[in-house]
UniProtKB/Swiss-Prot annotation:
Biased composition (Basic residues): 916-934, 1035-1044
Composition bias type Polar residues, residue spans: 11-21
Cystine crosslinks: none
Gene that encodes the chain: NMCP1A
GO-annotated cellular components: nuclear lamina; nuclear matrix
Name assigned to this protein: Nuclear matrix constituent protein 1a
Lineage, top ranks: Eukaryota, Viridiplantae, Streptophyta, Embryophyta, Tracheophyta
Family: Belongs to the CRWN family.
Region of interest: Disordered: 1-36, 293-315, 910-934, 953-1155
Length: 1155
């Protein structure tokens, strides 16, 4: 500030005393005149001093006004800045809310796109299923066509044979003509079928075209949706970039305002320091001017030091700015390099994606080019936003890659469809060729007929026929004419059919041409895409050039900024020098003024200055406090805004991480889908192998069935006595040949069975039980056993449903590997051929079980005899709802050596709970064998009673034989089985044979018993050593049955009959066994009323000398305890109903056969 220069100070004026004379010796008379002059001078001086004081006060007032104006301006600037801060905060909050809303909209768009992807995947799956169905139908039709071809060839051969026979016999010509007519009718019917099949193929082709069109429409809609979503994304990116630009501009404004505030603070501090210095100087100048000068000098020194510090600070700031500029340049260069790499990667990805895109993406490419150009224009302003925008573009490109892969798959499916159409065309051409062959054959037939006609004419000329023969010949010729006319009609129809086939061929050729046109169209589109690739490469080069130009521009800008900073530094130094000079001038002026004014009115000025100082200090303190408060408020608000921005940035980063995680999850889901597809393909292959194995087994079943039919026809009548063994076989042998059940080919018929849980069970059961036992089922219809209920099957199915599909396939493959034909047919065949061969019990699952359980496995031995020829057939039928029967049969005959051996079926009636546990270990479809009684069986027993009479009653009373009754409960089973080893001169090998295709592994844990002398543990060979009494063994087995679980096996003791006289080889080692062995009655014991059924074994043998159950065999001890002994513990719980049910079916059958 400039102040006007006042007058120079003239020094202090002291008034002269009244007595002092000023003239040095003047007279007294001159004294009044001197006083007047002194007063006038004094008044003038006082007036001058007053003027000077007024002048100085005016100067002070002017300075005061100026300071107040400056304070008002600063206050206004602060208020304006506060308002601007509030507005910017409100705008920032609005921008954040809009950003959140757009993020929500983006998420919704992503969800919609995910739904579209899932819908497309579902559509692809449906298309593949339809393709599989079409393949399956085509394979079926191919097999039908092949069968038709075979039948047509056979018939053709028959027609040729008949035509050759017509030359020899004219009488048979009519028959052959009629047969030819029938064959032609069949050919016409087959041709009609072929026409229907052609129509069906055409309809299917049209339906396929419609589906393809629908798919194309859906893909077009999907592309439109994609375009819309891409446009939305680009709009959102633009808005985000605008907001980020605004935020950057606001940050720059904040920085500028902070710098201005700092400068204002520095100015205020400087002014405060100067004011304090002035006040101190004024207080000290009043006391000592010299001290003021020294203080001024010290202040000058301090100012110099401060100037030095300021210079040092400015140098540090300039160095920092240079370092910061270098860092910024380096970071900018690194970012540019990373951006270049990202652009390169993006361009490569875009090239890969554009290779698979179609013409429909041209509009998208144009829009993308425009968007990229706009984004490039914004890159110069938004260098910090490039990373985020690039990540979003990469995500979008990944989506495009997935969609392009889907389109590739769809194109592959279209190619497969084209291949199928070509195959169908070839098939139709083959059919047309076959029709032409048929036409040629008909023409050859016509030629043969004409030749026959000529031969007949020659014979007429050669032979002189009678009138009757002539009439017959005329009739024959008329018939031949009719047949010729019919052949002509048929040939015309065949020509029409050939024309239709030609028309169809033309249609197919037209369709093929359309497909060729489509291919050319696709090739053109590929060329367009290549051109677009070239354009993109050019665009990439242009972008690189632009980036280089921008880098140069940025370098120029940075240089200009450095120059501006240097100029600013110079201007600051000049301003500091100017202010220093002004301060020096002010000090000089103040010194002069103070030297003038303070010497005159020291005390007045002191009082006034003290008051003024106090008031000014108060005002300054108040203003300083207000300024400090405002600055603190502004700083706090700026900190809060920075914290809010940081928190929002962190939220955005977290959301980006979540999106990346979702991408990874989608990739994992796709990989899982691919693995599932591979597993499904493997399952399909395994099912095809199973279907082939089932076909082979069906052929084996047919062979075995034919062998059985041959055996039954050979041995329908007994060789010795001529008695008919199998009654009703003639009625059942061929009547129900159409009812023979084959194993179901459910796996072959449909790869997607509606009930896959029961697949392994059905395949296992049907493989072993379907085809071979049809005749045995017919034989078993004579006995009319009651079928099993469906509850057993439901329990089995519930146990199997919990298994996986892969496990059931493995089990089915294991059952294929373990398959062996059942030994019943070998037993029957060998028994009739009088060969003693022990049959195998079945295929065990483990070799160790075969080694450990040889003693417990039951063997069957068949032997022939002369005494009596009898067949003991014990059959059990189990119906499981699908009319699948399981029959247990045993065939008994008499050995040539005169020994009877009974093949004893063991009926397994274990509780269902235990069977379910066993099925969970071995999940193979096994049918249960059960015996139940129906009214038909009771009627048979009543008939037997009427015939036999008293003998039957005696057999009912005799209940102590070799039969065993076993009661089983749910918690434990009473093992009351005793294994009969050897009687005196007979050994019985019994084997449980289940003809339901099931070879069960039976484990029998027998209690440890002491062996009697001459007794053998295992029935492996024939022995003639007599057994001692085994009553002790039975008692021990009764004691051991409480802690062991066994299945009952009772072996009947074979005895010699009346064949001793006829065959002396047997000797007289044993007597005929009692009728206990023949009329043995198995009993059913129930531990809990009707809950469970124990296993029942029937021992039945027939001898010739049957007198009494006690007197006939005095030497033979019973090998097994009687049913009454074992059932003594359970008689209290049995009811009358259980006693009625416990009658022996074997006895009824024996009584039936004796009738």
């Amino acid at each position: 500030m400039f102040t006007p220069q006042g007058k120079g100070w003239t020094g202090w004026s002291t008034p002269a005393p009244a007595n002092q004379r000023s003239g040095g010796g003047a007279p007294a008379a001159s004294a009044p005149l001197g006083k007047g002059k002194g007063t006038t001078l004094r008044v003038a001086e006082l007036e001058q001093e007053l003027h000077e004081y007024q002048y100085n006060m005016g100067l002070l007032l002017i300075e005061k006004k100026e300071w107040t104006a400056k304070l008002d301006e600063i206050n206004q600037a602060l208020t304006q800045k506060e308002e601007i801060l509030k507005r910017e905060q409100a705008a920032h909050l609005n921008a954040i809310s809009e950003y959140e809303r757009r993020e929500e909209s983006m998420r919704k768009a992503l969800g919609v796109e995910k739904q579209c992807v899932t819908d497309l995947e579902k559509a692809l799956r449906e298309i593949r299923g339809e393709i599989a169905e079409v393949k399956f139908m085509s394979e079926k039709k191919i097999t039908d066509a092949q069968s038709l071809e075979a039948s047509l060839e056979e018939k053709r051969l028959e027609i040729e044979g008949k035509l050759h026979a017509a030359d020899a016999k004219l009488a048979e010509a009519n028959r052959k003509k009629s047969q030819a007519d029938r064959d032609l009718e069949e050919v016409e019917a087959r041709q009609r079928r072929l026409e229907k099949e052609k129509l069906y193929f055409e309809n299917e082709r049209k339906a396929g075209e419609d589906r393809i069109k629908r798919q194309e429409d859906s893909l077009r809609d999907w592309d439109k949706k994609l375009k819309e979503s891409q446009n939305r994304i680009l709009d959102l990116q633009r808005s985000l970039n605008d907001r980020e630009e605004r935020a950057n501009e606001n940050d720059k404004l904040f920085k500028i305002k902070q710098e201005e505030l700092e400068e204002a603070k520095k100015a205020l501090e400087h002014t405060k320091a100067t004011l304090k210095i002035k006040e101190d100087d004024i207080n000290k100048r009043l006391a000592e001017l010299h001290l003021q000068e020294k203080e001024a000098e010290s202040k000058n020194r301090k100012l110099e030091e401060r100037e030095k510090k300021i210079a040092e600070r400015e140098e540090k700031v300039s160095a920092r700015e240079k370092v910061g500029l270098q860092k910024l340049l380096e970071d900018h260069n690194v970012k540019l390099e990373s951006k270049r790499r990202d652009f390169d990667l993006q361009l490569e990805n875009e090239k890969k994606s554009f290779d698979a895109m179609l013409v429909q993406k041209e509009a998208d490419l144009v829009q993308r080019e425009k968007d990229v150009r706009s984004s490039e224009e914004k890159l110069s302003k938004k260098e910090q936003v490039l990373n985020e925008s690039k990540k979003k573009l990469e995500e979008w490109q990944n989506d495009l890659d997935t969609k392009s892969n889907a389109l590739k798959k769809w194109e592959e499916s279209l190619q497969n469809d084209e291949k199928q159409l070509s195959e169908q065309k070839l098939q139709i051409e083959n059919e047309r060729k076959q029709a032409e062959m048929y036409k040629l054959e008909l023409e050859s037939l016509k030629a043969t007929v004409v030749a026959e006609k000529e031969k007949i004419l020659q014979e007429q000329n050669n032979l002189k026929l009678t009138e009757e023969e002539r009439q017959e010949h005329i009739m024959l010729t008329a018939q031949l004419k009719k047949e010729i006319d019919e052949y002509r009609m048929r040939s015309n129809s065949l020509s029409e059919e050939t024309e239709d086939l030609r028309k169809q061929r033309q249609k197919f050729e037209e369709e093929w041409e359309q497909l060729d046109e489509k291919r050319t169209h696709l090739e053109e589109e590929a060329k367009k895409l290549n051109n677009e690739k070239k354009n993109l490469e050019r665009w990439h080069d242009n972008e690189e050039k632009r980036l280089k130009d921008r880098e140069d521009e940025l370098d120029i800008k940075y240089k200009e900024q450095g120059e501006n900073l240097a100029l600013k530094e110079k201007s600051l130094i000049d301003n500091i020098d100017h202010q220093r000079l002004e301060n020096e001038e002010l000090l000089k002026r103040e010194r002069a003024d103070l030297q003038r004014n303070l010497q005159l009115h020291r005390h007045e000025l002191e009082m006034e200055m003290e008051k003024k100082q106090a008031s000014k200090e108060r005002e300054l303190e108040e203003k300083e406090n207000e300024l400090n408060r405002k600055m603190d408020f502004v700083e706090n608000e700026l900190k809060r805004a920075a914290e809010l921005n940081e928190s929002k940035i962190q939220k955005i980063l977290l959301e980006k991480k979540q999106l990346q995680k979702e991408k990874e999850v989608l990739v994992e889901d796709r990989q899982k889908l691919e693995t599932d597809k591979a597993d499904i393909r493997r399952d399909i292959d395994s099912l095809n192998t199973l279907s082939k194995s089932l076909k082979e087994r069906r052929e084996a079943y047919n062979r075995d069935r034919n062998n059985l039919i041959d055996i039954f026809e050979k041995y329908k009548v007994c060789k010795n006595c001529g008695v008919i063994i199998f009654e009703g076989l003639d009625a059942l042998a061929l009547k129900d040949s159409t009812d023979i059940e084959y194993p179901s080919l459910a796996v072959e018929a449909d790869d997607r069975s509606p009930n896959p849980d029961t697949l392994a069970q059905e395949t296992g059961a049907l493989v072993n039980s379907g085809g071979r036992l049809s005749l045995l089922q017919k034989c078993s219809r004579i006995f009319k056993f009651s079928p099993r209920k469906k509850a057993e099957q439901s329990s089995e199915q519930q146990a199997v449903k919990n298994t996986d599909f892969g496990a059931r396939l493995e089990e089915a493959s294991q059952s294929d590997d373990d398959y062996e034909p059942t030994p019943v047919y070998q037993v029957a065949y060998n028994s009739f051929d009088a060969e003693d061969l022990p049959s195998e019990s079945g295929a065990f699952e483990n070799e160790e079980s075969e080694r450990q359980d040889i003693a417990d496995d039951v063997q069957m031995e068949s032997s022939l005899g002369v005494a009596d020829n009898c067949v003991d057939i014990h059959g059990t039928q189990s119906f499981d709802g699908n009319t699948d029967m399981v029959v247990d049969t045993t065939i008994v005959d008499v050995d040539q050596n005169g020994k009877d051996s009974a093949v004893l079926p063991v009926v397994d009636l274990e509780p269902e709970t235990s069977k379910q546990g066993r099925r969970q270990q071995n999940r193979k479809g096994r049918a249960k064998g059960g015996v139940k009684r129906t009214r038909s069986v009771l009627a048979v027993v009543e008939d037997a009673k009427e015939i036999l009479g008293e003998n039957l009653e005696v057999k009912k009373d005799d209940g102590q034989g070799d039969s065993v009754t076993v009661g089983g409960t749910r918690k434990r089973r009473f093992a009351g089985a005793t294994i009969s080893e050897q009687d005196e001169d007979s050994e019985a090998h019994s084997e449980s044979v289940s003809l339901g295709g099931q070879r069960r592994k039976r484990r029998q844990t027998a209690a440890a018993v002491t062996q009697a002398p001459g007794e053998k543990r295992y029935n492996l060979r024939r022995t003639t050593v007599a057994n001692a009494a085994t009553a002790a063994q039975t008692n021990k087995k009764k004691a051991a049955k409480k802690g062991s679980k066994q299945t009952v096996e009772a072996t009947a003791d074979d005895t010699e009959g009346t064949s001793k006289a006829e065959e002396p080889a047997t000797g007289s080692k044993g007597a005929s066994q009692s009728a206990d062995d023949a009329s043995q009655l198995p009993e059913y014991s129930q531990a809990e009323a009707g809950d469970t059924h124990g296993p029942v074994e029937v021992t039945s043998a027939e001898g010739v000398d049957i007198v009494d159950g006690i007197d006939a065999a005095p030497d033979a001890m019973p090998m097994t305890p009687s049913g009454s002994e074992l059932g003594a513990e359970q008689d209290d719980e049995e009811d009358d109903d259980s006693e009625r049910r416990n009658q022996s079916i074997g006895k009824k059958l024996w009584s039936f056969f004796t009738t």
